[in-house]
Amino acid sequence: MLELCLLGCGGMMPLPHRKLTSLMARYNGKSILIDCGEGTQVGIKEKGWSFKPIGVICFTHYHADHISGLPGLLLTLGNAQRTEPLLMIGPRGLERVVNALRVIAPDLPFPIEFRELKEKSETIEMDGYRLRAFRVNHNVICYGYTIEIGRAHV
């Protein structure tokens, strides 16, 4: 069963009861994170979900309210003794942006793999599902994501 949780939907500045943008999906014991705004870790803990099964982090774009929670999350994953690779998916510039944020998390016990999106629409075959990325209209290059399981799409 696919489980979804909107961890945050605020913009620009976190508020006490409104964290910045992030959504987590769980399927077959694995988790996907879409965006990682400030407060993402708090939202995951409030939901009672675990960090360790996060295998994929997708970014829609690189405004701060969508990426500012990443350094802390990487440190938390490292402290959880994660050794499995972490896949990150996002628009062009992904590796440069992530590596700039890793200044405070330079030594991690797991590798990070990067998949930069270049086409208007791309489908990525995952373990038991498909992740479809598609361009959306914004003032910077931006993607939306659909999780496809069989004939169901979310």
Model-derived segments and their meaning:
Residues 14-17, 127-151:
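Active-site-proximal loop/helix segment associated with metal-binding centers of metalloenzymes
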Residues 1-2, 122-131:
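Beta-strand-turn-beta hairpins that frame and shape the catalytic cleft
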